[in-house]
Protein backbone atom coordinates (compact mmCIF):
# COMPACT_ATOMS: atom_id res chain seq x y z
CA UNK A 1 0.00 0.00 0.00
CA UNK A 2 1.28 3.47 -0.88
CA UNK A 3 0.32 6.31 1.46
CA UNK A 4 1.35 8.82 -1.22
CA UNK A 5 3.70 10.64 1.16
CA UNK A 6 7.03 12.23 0.22
CA UNK A 7 10.11 10.17 1.15
CA UNK A 8 11.90 11.07 4.39
CA UNK A 9 14.97 13.30 4.07
CA UNK A 10 18.38 11.68 3.64
CA UNK A 11 19.34 13.07 7.05
CA UNK A 12 16.90 14.35 9.62
CA UNK A 13 17.42 16.47 12.72
CA UNK A 14 17.15 13.81 15.45
CA UNK A 15 20.93 13.76 15.98
CA UNK A 16 21.47 17.50 15.39
CA UNK A 17 23.36 19.18 18.21
CA UNK A 18 21.01 21.32 20.27
CA UNK A 19 21.83 24.91 21.19
CA UNK A 20 20.87 25.21 24.85
CA UNK A 21 19.75 28.69 25.92
CA UNK A 22 19.50 29.58 29.61
CA UNK A 23 18.72 33.28 29.77
CA UNK A 24 15.77 35.66 30.04
CA UNK A 25 12.43 34.14 29.02
CA UNK A 26 9.33 35.65 27.41
CA UNK A 27 6.58 33.08 27.84
CA UNK A 28 3.36 32.49 29.77
CA UNK A 29 3.48 30.44 32.96
CA UNK A 30 1.86 27.02 33.36
CA UNK A 31 -1.30 28.49 34.90
CA UNK A 32 -2.58 29.20 31.39
CA UNK A 33 -3.23 25.48 30.86
CA UNK A 34 -6.18 25.84 33.22
CA UNK A 35 -7.97 27.83 30.50
CA UNK A 36 -8.50 24.76 28.30
CA UNK A 37 -8.41 22.10 31.03
CA UNK A 38 -11.35 23.54 33.00
CA UNK A 39 -13.50 23.35 29.85
CA UNK A 40 -12.46 19.77 29.17
CA UNK A 41 -12.86 18.30 32.67
CA UNK A 42 -16.46 19.00 33.51
CA UNK A 43 -16.55 17.94 37.16
CA UNK A 44 -13.15 19.40 38.07
CA UNK A 45 -12.25 22.66 39.77
CA UNK A 46 -8.84 24.34 39.60
CA UNK A 47 -7.99 26.35 42.71
CA UNK A 48 -4.87 28.43 42.20
CA UNK A 49 -3.08 29.24 45.44
CA UNK A 50 -1.52 32.52 44.42
CA UNK A 51 -1.73 36.27 44.12
CA UNK A 52 -4.19 38.73 42.61
CA UNK A 53 -1.92 38.78 39.55
CA UNK A 54 -2.66 35.07 39.06
CA UNK A 55 -6.39 35.77 39.36
CA UNK A 56 -6.25 38.61 36.82
CA UNK A 57 -4.26 36.44 34.38
CA UNK A 58 -6.80 33.62 34.49
CA UNK A 59 -9.85 35.86 34.31
CA UNK A 60 -8.58 37.91 31.37
CA UNK A 61 -7.14 34.92 29.48
CA UNK A 62 -10.36 32.91 29.85
CA UNK A 63 -12.60 35.86 29.01
CA UNK A 64 -14.89 34.80 31.87
CA UNK A 65 -16.21 37.05 34.60
CA UNK A 66 -15.64 35.47 37.98
CA UNK A 67 -19.29 35.93 39.06
CA UNK A 68 -20.20 33.47 36.27
CA UNK A 69 -18.70 30.80 38.54
CA UNK A 70 -16.33 29.08 36.11
CA UNK A 71 -14.56 25.90 37.17
CA UNK A 72 -11.47 27.75 38.36
CA UNK A 73 -10.64 30.32 41.00
CA UNK A 74 -7.83 31.77 43.08
CA UNK A 75 -7.20 31.46 46.80
CA UNK A 76 -5.38 34.78 47.17
CA UNK A 77 -2.33 34.80 49.41
CA UNK A 78 -2.42 38.04 51.41
CA UNK A 79 0.54 39.89 52.92
CA UNK A 80 0.04 38.16 56.27
CA UNK A 81 0.31 34.77 54.53
CA UNK A 82 3.50 35.78 52.74
CA UNK A 83 4.94 37.17 55.98
CA UNK A 84 4.17 33.96 57.87
CA UNK A 85 1.76 35.70 60.24
CA UNK A 86 -1.14 33.37 59.40
CA UNK A 87 -1.49 29.61 59.10
CA UNK A 88 -1.82 29.30 55.33
CA UNK A 89 -2.77 25.62 55.57
CA UNK A 90 -5.66 26.31 57.95
CA UNK A 91 -6.92 29.11 55.71
CA UNK A 92 -6.63 26.87 52.65
CA UNK A 93 -8.65 24.15 54.40
CA UNK A 94 -11.39 26.67 55.20
CA UNK A 95 -11.50 27.92 51.60
CA UNK A 96 -11.76 24.37 50.26
CA UNK A 97 -14.53 23.52 52.75
CA UNK A 98 -16.51 26.58 51.62
CA UNK A 99 -15.92 25.84 47.94
CA UNK A 100 -17.06 22.22 48.14
CA UNK A 101 -20.12 23.15 50.20
CA UNK A 102 -21.13 25.71 47.56
CA UNK A 103 -20.25 23.52 44.55
CA UNK A 104 -21.39 19.94 45.33
CA UNK A 105 -20.87 18.96 41.67
CA UNK A 106 -17.07 19.02 42.08
CA UNK A 107 -15.49 15.55 41.98
CA UNK A 108 -11.88 16.52 41.25
CA UNK A 109 -10.18 19.46 42.93
CA UNK A 110 -6.75 20.61 41.79
CA UNK A 111 -4.64 22.75 44.10
CA UNK A 112 -2.41 24.64 41.69
CA UNK A 113 0.87 26.09 42.88
CA UNK A 114 2.00 29.54 41.73
CA UNK A 115 5.07 31.72 42.15
CA UNK A 116 3.95 33.09 45.56
CA UNK A 117 3.08 29.66 46.98
CA UNK A 118 6.41 28.30 45.75
CA UNK A 119 8.31 31.19 47.33
CA UNK A 120 6.78 30.63 50.79
CA UNK A 121 7.24 26.85 50.40
CA UNK A 122 3.58 26.02 50.93
CA UNK A 123 3.40 22.21 50.73
CA UNK A 124 0.40 21.70 48.45
CA UNK A 125 1.21 18.02 47.97
CA UNK A 126 0.68 17.35 51.66
CA UNK A 127 -2.37 19.64 51.65
CA UNK A 128 -3.89 17.62 48.79
CA UNK A 129 -3.35 14.36 50.69
CA UNK A 130 -4.93 15.84 53.81
CA UNK A 131 -7.93 17.24 51.96
CA UNK A 132 -8.44 14.03 49.97
CA UNK A 133 -8.61 12.07 53.20
CA UNK A 134 -11.12 14.56 54.60
CA UNK A 135 -13.38 14.94 51.54
CA UNK A 136 -12.94 11.56 49.87
CA UNK A 137 -14.09 9.38 48.33
CA UNK A 138 -16.64 11.82 46.85
CA UNK A 139 -13.91 14.32 45.97
CA UNK A 140 -10.31 13.55 45.08
CA UNK A 141 -7.84 16.37 45.61
CA UNK A 142 -4.71 16.65 43.46
CA UNK A 143 -1.94 19.18 43.24
CA UNK A 144 0.42 20.40 40.57
CA UNK A 145 2.54 23.47 39.93
CA UNK A 146 1.75 26.14 37.38
CA UNK A 147 4.41 28.46 38.75
CA UNK A 148 6.39 30.54 36.29
CA UNK A 149 9.47 29.65 38.33
CA UNK A 150 9.03 25.98 37.43
CA UNK A 151 6.83 25.81 34.33
CA UNK A 152 6.23 27.44 30.97
CA UNK A 153 2.89 27.76 29.20
CA UNK A 154 1.83 24.22 28.13
CA UNK A 155 3.69 22.51 30.97
CA UNK A 156 0.67 23.22 33.14
CA UNK A 157 -1.34 20.56 31.30
CA UNK A 158 1.56 18.12 31.54
CA UNK A 159 1.86 18.66 35.29
CA UNK A 160 -1.91 18.27 35.72
CA UNK A 161 -2.16 14.99 33.81
CA UNK A 162 0.99 13.63 35.46
CA UNK A 163 -0.63 14.23 38.86
CA UNK A 164 -3.66 12.14 37.82
CA UNK A 165 -1.80 9.11 36.44
CA UNK A 166 -0.76 7.54 39.81
CA UNK A 167 -4.42 7.50 40.90
CA UNK A 168 -5.83 5.81 37.77
CA UNK A 169 -7.26 2.34 38.37
CA UNK A 170 -5.16 -0.67 37.41
CA UNK A 171 -6.31 -2.81 34.50
CA UNK A 172 -5.08 -5.83 32.56
CA UNK A 173 -7.23 -4.99 29.54
CA UNK A 174 -5.68 -4.35 26.15
CA UNK A 175 -6.68 -0.72 25.52
CA UNK A 176 -5.57 2.32 23.58
CA UNK A 177 -5.23 5.51 25.58
CA UNK A 178 -5.18 8.90 23.82
CA UNK A 179 -3.28 11.35 26.01
CA UNK A 180 -3.68 15.11 25.85
CA UNK A 181 -6.54 17.60 25.92
CA UNK A 182 -8.25 18.27 22.60
CA UNK A 183 -11.40 20.23 21.73
CA UNK A 184 -14.35 17.83 21.92
CA UNK A 185 -15.07 17.96 18.18
CA UNK A 186 -11.44 17.10 17.36
CA UNK A 187 -11.32 14.29 19.92
CA UNK A 188 -14.51 12.87 18.42
CA UNK A 189 -12.90 12.90 14.96
CA UNK A 190 -9.87 10.99 16.25
CA UNK A 191 -11.95 8.39 18.08
CA UNK A 192 -14.21 7.99 15.03
CA UNK A 193 -11.25 7.27 12.72
CA UNK A 194 -9.78 4.77 15.17
CA UNK A 195 -13.14 3.07 15.63
CA UNK A 196 -13.56 2.76 11.85
CA UNK A 197 -10.15 1.08 11.78
CA UNK A 198 -11.49 -1.50 14.22
CA UNK A 199 -9.36 -0.27 17.12
CA UNK A 200 -10.91 -0.22 20.56
CA UNK A 201 -11.74 0.37 23.23
CA UNK A 202 -10.29 3.88 22.95
CA UNK A 203 -9.97 5.79 26.23
CA UNK A 204 -8.95 9.42 26.72
CA UNK A 205 -6.90 11.28 29.31
CA UNK A 206 -8.12 13.69 30.54
CA UNK A 207 -11.62 12.26 30.76
CA UNK A 208 -14.67 14.52 30.85
CA UNK A 209 -15.71 13.18 34.27
CA UNK A 210 -13.90 11.46 37.12
CA UNK A 211 -16.12 8.37 36.75
CA UNK A 212 -14.81 7.94 33.18
CA UNK A 213 -11.14 7.84 34.20
CA UNK A 214 -9.25 5.22 32.16
CA UNK A 215 -7.42 2.28 33.64
CA UNK A 216 -3.69 1.76 33.13
CA UNK A 217 -1.62 -1.40 33.16
CA UNK A 218 0.93 -3.53 31.30
CA UNK A 219 -1.42 -4.08 28.35
CA UNK A 220 -2.18 -0.38 27.91
CA UNK A 221 -0.66 1.35 24.90
CA UNK A 222 -0.87 5.11 24.63
CA UNK A 223 -0.54 7.68 21.88
CA UNK A 224 0.19 11.30 22.69
CA UNK A 225 -1.79 13.98 20.85
CA UNK A 226 0.29 16.84 22.29
CA UNK A 227 4.10 16.96 22.19
CA UNK A 228 4.52 18.74 25.54
CA UNK A 229 3.54 15.81 27.78
CA UNK A 230 6.97 14.58 28.88
CA UNK A 231 6.12 14.12 32.57
CA UNK A 232 2.83 12.40 31.74
CA UNK A 233 4.68 10.09 29.34
CA UNK A 234 7.07 9.16 32.16
CA UNK A 235 4.25 8.62 34.67
CA UNK A 236 2.36 6.29 32.31
CA UNK A 237 5.52 4.36 31.50
CA UNK A 238 6.13 3.80 35.21
CA UNK A 239 2.60 2.34 35.44
CA UNK A 240 3.59 -0.23 32.78
CA UNK A 241 1.94 1.41 29.76
CA UNK A 242 3.81 1.53 26.44
CA UNK A 243 4.12 4.55 24.17
CA UNK A 244 3.37 4.32 20.43
CA UNK A 245 5.96 6.70 18.98
CA UNK A 246 4.87 8.61 15.88
CA UNK A 247 4.90 12.08 14.34
CA UNK A 248 2.17 14.25 15.82
CA UNK A 249 -1.15 14.54 13.94
CA UNK A 250 -0.64 17.96 12.35
CA UNK A 251 -1.43 18.08 8.63
CA UNK A 252 -2.22 15.16 6.36
CA UNK A 253 1.23 13.55 6.65
CA UNK A 254 1.45 13.79 10.43
CA UNK A 255 -2.10 12.51 10.89
CA UNK A 256 -1.56 9.61 8.48
CA UNK A 257 1.70 8.50 10.13
CA UNK A 258 0.18 8.86 13.62
CA UNK A 259 -2.80 6.70 12.64
CA UNK A 260 -0.55 4.22 10.80
CA UNK A 261 1.63 3.67 13.87
CA UNK A 262 -1.47 2.85 15.94
CA UNK A 263 -2.95 0.70 13.16
CA UNK A 264 0.27 -1.32 12.93
CA UNK A 265 0.24 -1.83 16.70
CA UNK A 266 -3.27 -3.29 16.49
CA UNK A 267 -2.72 -5.34 13.32
CA UNK A 268 -5.02 -3.35 11.03
CA UNK A 269 -4.70 -4.48 7.41
CA UNK A 270 -3.35 -2.16 4.71
CA UNK A 271 -6.64 -2.45 2.83
CA UNK A 272 -8.70 -1.36 5.83
CA UNK A 273 -6.34 1.52 6.57
CA UNK A 274 -6.59 2.77 2.98
CA UNK A 275 -10.38 2.44 2.91
CA UNK A 276 -10.80 4.46 6.12
CA UNK A 277 -8.20 7.19 5.55
CA UNK A 278 -8.15 7.74 1.77
CA UNK A 279 -11.02 10.26 1.60
CA UNK A 280 -10.12 12.44 4.62
CA UNK A 281 -6.46 12.25 3.62
CA UNK A 282 -7.27 13.60 0.15
CA UNK A 283 -9.44 16.38 1.62
CA UNK A 284 -6.66 17.39 3.98
CA UNK A 285 -4.02 17.39 1.24
CA UNK A 286 -6.21 19.57 -0.97
CA UNK A 287 -6.99 21.98 1.87
CA UNK A 288 -3.33 22.34 2.85
CA UNK A 289 -2.27 22.91 -0.77
CA UNK A 290 -4.82 25.71 -1.16
CA UNK A 291 -4.09 27.39 2.18
CA UNK A 292 -0.29 27.19 1.90
CA UNK A 293 0.05 28.65 -1.58
CA UNK A 294 1.69 31.82 -0.25
CA UNK A 295 4.11 29.93 2.01
CA UNK A 296 6.07 27.93 -0.53
CA UNK A 297 9.70 28.97 -0.83
CA UNK A 298 9.53 31.17 2.28
CA UNK A 299 11.52 30.83 5.51
CA UNK A 300 10.26 30.46 9.09
CA UNK A 301 11.91 31.06 12.47
CA UNK A 302 10.37 29.54 15.62
CA UNK A 303 11.02 31.23 18.94
CA UNK A 304 10.38 28.90 21.93
CA UNK A 305 6.86 29.01 23.35
CA UNK A 306 4.72 25.86 23.52
CA UNK A 307 6.82 22.77 22.63
CA UNK A 308 4.70 22.40 19.48
CA UNK A 309 7.54 23.96 17.48
CA UNK A 310 9.36 20.84 16.13
CA UNK A 311 6.09 19.21 15.02
CA UNK A 312 4.92 22.42 13.34
CA UNK A 313 8.32 22.86 11.68
CA UNK A 314 7.90 19.39 10.22
CA UNK A 315 4.45 20.34 8.95
CA UNK A 316 5.60 23.61 7.37
CA UNK A 317 8.72 22.19 5.73
CA UNK A 318 7.17 18.93 4.51
CA UNK A 319 3.63 19.96 3.61
CA UNK A 320 3.81 23.71 2.99
CA UNK A 321 7.14 24.04 1.18
CA UNK A 322 8.81 26.34 3.71
CA UNK A 323 12.39 26.22 4.98
CA UNK A 324 13.14 26.41 8.70
CA UNK A 325 15.92 28.73 9.86
CA UNK A 326 15.71 27.91 13.58
CA UNK A 327 13.37 25.72 15.59
CA UNK A 328 13.36 26.91 19.18
CA UNK A 329 11.36 25.11 21.86
CA UNK A 330 11.21 25.43 25.68
CA UNK A 331 12.16 21.75 26.12
CA UNK A 332 13.17 19.15 23.56
CA UNK A 333 12.13 15.58 24.46
CA UNK A 334 13.78 13.44 21.77
CA UNK A 335 11.91 10.31 22.85
CA UNK A 336 8.61 12.02 22.10
CA UNK A 337 9.61 14.29 19.21
CA UNK A 338 12.12 11.97 17.54
CA UNK A 339 9.74 10.84 14.74
CA UNK A 340 9.03 14.48 13.83
CA UNK A 341 12.72 15.39 13.97
CA UNK A 342 13.50 12.49 11.62
CA UNK A 343 11.32 14.18 8.98
CA UNK A 344 12.88 17.66 9.22
CA UNK A 345 15.74 17.85 6.74
CA UNK A 346 19.10 18.61 8.30
CA UNK A 347 19.90 22.32 8.28
CA UNK A 348 17.92 24.42 10.78
CA UNK A 349 19.32 25.32 14.19
CA UNK A 350 17.62 23.42 17.02
CA UNK A 351 17.52 25.43 20.25
CA UNK A 352 16.16 24.53 23.68
CA UNK A 353 15.25 27.11 26.28
CA UNK A 354 15.37 30.84 25.83
CA UNK A 355 17.73 33.77 25.90
CA UNK A 356 15.53 36.47 24.40
CA UNK A 357 18.14 39.02 23.35
CA UNK A 358 20.42 36.45 21.71
CA UNK A 359 17.52 34.86 19.86
CA UNK A 360 16.24 38.23 18.66
CA UNK A 361 19.72 38.97 17.34
CA UNK A 362 19.56 35.75 15.31
CA UNK A 363 16.09 36.68 14.00
CA UNK A 364 17.40 40.07 12.86
CA UNK A 365 20.41 38.45 11.20
CA UNK A 366 18.35 35.79 9.39
CA UNK A 367 15.48 38.11 8.29
CA UNK A 368 12.98 35.20 7.99
CA UNK A 369 9.77 35.61 6.02
CA UNK A 370 7.76 34.50 9.07
CA UNK A 371 8.62 34.52 12.78
CA UNK A 372 6.49 32.44 15.16
CA UNK A 373 6.73 33.94 18.64
CA UNK A 374 4.93 34.90 21.83
CA UNK A 375 2.60 37.87 22.20
CA UNK A 376 5.17 40.00 23.98
CA UNK A 377 7.64 39.79 21.10
CA UNK A 378 5.27 40.02 18.13
CA UNK A 379 4.49 43.75 18.16
CA UNK A 380 8.13 44.89 18.58
CA UNK A 381 9.16 42.61 15.71
CA UNK A 382 6.28 43.84 13.54
CA UNK A 383 7.46 47.40 14.20
CA UNK A 384 10.87 46.38 12.84
CA UNK A 385 9.25 45.10 9.65
CA UNK A 386 9.06 41.38 10.47
CA UNK A 387 6.01 39.24 9.73
CA UNK A 388 4.96 37.38 12.87
CA UNK A 389 2.56 34.69 13.99
CA UNK A 390 1.31 34.54 17.57
CA UNK A 391 2.32 31.13 18.90
CA UNK A 392 -0.55 31.13 21.40
CA UNK A 393 -3.10 30.82 18.56
CA UNK A 394 -1.61 27.45 17.64
CA UNK A 395 -2.51 26.15 21.11
CA UNK A 396 -6.01 27.62 21.42
CA UNK A 397 -7.18 26.91 17.85
CA UNK A 398 -8.28 23.39 16.76
CA UNK A 399 -5.39 22.28 14.51
CA UNK A 400 -5.09 18.48 14.88
CA UNK A 401 -6.04 15.74 12.39
CA UNK A 402 -7.29 15.76 8.81
CA UNK A 403 -10.28 18.09 9.03
CA UNK A 404 -8.25 20.92 10.61
CA UNK A 405 -5.16 20.59 8.38
CA UNK A 406 -6.20 23.41 6.05
CA UNK A 407 -7.00 25.67 9.01
CA UNK A 408 -3.52 25.01 10.42
CA UNK A 409 -1.86 26.04 7.16
CA UNK A 410 -4.11 29.09 7.04
CA UNK A 411 -2.92 30.27 10.45
CA UNK A 412 0.58 30.63 9.00
CA UNK A 413 -0.37 31.94 5.56
CA UNK A 414 -2.64 34.77 6.76
CA UNK A 415 0.11 36.97 8.28
CA UNK A 416 2.27 36.44 5.18
CA UNK A 417 -0.65 37.43 2.95
CA UNK A 418 -1.43 40.44 5.17
CA UNK A 419 2.16 41.67 4.92
CA UNK A 420 2.10 41.34 1.13
CA UNK A 421 -1.13 43.39 0.94
CA UNK A 422 0.33 46.12 3.17
CA UNK A 423 3.43 46.32 1.01
CA UNK A 424 1.35 46.68 -2.15
CA UNK A 425 -0.77 49.41 -0.59
CA UNK A 426 2.34 51.25 0.60
CA UNK A 427 3.81 51.13 -2.90
CA UNK A 428 0.69 52.58 -4.56
Curated annotation (Swiss-Prot):
What biological-process terms (Gene Ontology) are attached? Answer: light-independent bacteriochlorophyll biosynthetic process; photosynthesis, dark reaction
Which UniProt keywords are present, listed alphabetically?
Answer: 4Fe-4S, ATP-binding, Bacteriochlorophyll biosynthesis, Chlorophyll biosynthesis, Iron, Iron-sulfur, Metal-binding, Nucleotide-binding, Oxidoreductase, Photosynthesis
Q: Which reaction does it catalyse?
A: chlorophyllide a + oxidized 2[4Fe-4S]-[ferredoxin] + 2 ADP + 2 phosphate = protochlorophyllide a + reduced 2[4Fe-4S]-[ferredoxin] + 2 ATP + 2 H2O
Q: What does the record list as coiled-coil region(s)?
A: none
Q: What is its EC number?
A: 1.3.7.7
Query: Where do the annotations place [4Fe-4S] cluster binding?
Result: 29, 54, 115
Report the leader peptide range. none
Q: Entry cofactor note text?
A: Binds 1 [4Fe-4S] cluster per heterodimer. The cluster is bound at the heterodimer interface by residues from both subunits.
Give the pathway annotation: Porphyrin-containing compound metabolism; bacteriochlorophyll biosynthesis (light-independent)
Q: Give the domain of life.
A: Bacteria
Enzyme class comes to oxidoreductase
Cofactor(s) needed by this chain: [4Fe-4S] cluster
Q: Name one Pfam family in it.
A: Oxidored_nitro
ATP-binding among the record's keywords?
yes
- GO molecular function annotation: 4 iron, 4 sulfur cluster binding; ATP binding; metal ion binding; oxidoreductase activity, acting on iron-sulfur proteins as donors; oxidoreductase activity, acting on the CH-CH group of donors, iron-sulfur protein as acceptor
Q: What does this protein do?
A: Component of the dark-operative protochlorophyllide reductase (DPOR) that uses Mg-ATP and reduced ferredoxin to reduce ring D of protochlorophyllide (Pchlide) to form chlorophyllide a (Chlide). This reaction is light-independent. The NB-protein (BchN-BchB) is the catalytic component of the complex.
Task: Spell out the subunit comment.
Answer: Protochlorophyllide reductase is composed of three subunits; BchL, BchN and BchB. Forms a heterotetramer of two BchB and two BchN subunits.
Q: Which family does it belong to?
A: Belongs to the BchN/ChlN family.
Q: Which HAMAP family match?
A: ChlN_BchN (MF_00352)
Q: Name the chain's protein.
A: Light-independent protochlorophyllide reductase subunit N
Instruction: Provide the species name.
Output: Cereibacter sphaeroides (strain ATCC 17029 / ATH 2.4.9) (Rhodobacter sphaeroides)
Whichever gene encodes this chain, its name is bchN
Amino acid sequence: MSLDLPPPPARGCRSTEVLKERGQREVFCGLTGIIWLHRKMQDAFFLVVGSRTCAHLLQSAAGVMIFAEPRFGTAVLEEKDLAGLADANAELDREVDRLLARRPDIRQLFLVGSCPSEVIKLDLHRAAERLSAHHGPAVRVYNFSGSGIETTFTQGEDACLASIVPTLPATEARELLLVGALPDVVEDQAVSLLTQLGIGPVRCLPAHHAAEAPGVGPNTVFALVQPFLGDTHGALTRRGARHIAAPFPFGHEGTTLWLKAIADEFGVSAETFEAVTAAPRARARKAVAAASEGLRGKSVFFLPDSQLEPSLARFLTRECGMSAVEVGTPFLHRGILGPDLDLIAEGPVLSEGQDVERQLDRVRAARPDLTVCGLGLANPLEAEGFTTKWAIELVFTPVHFYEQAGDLAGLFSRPVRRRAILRREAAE
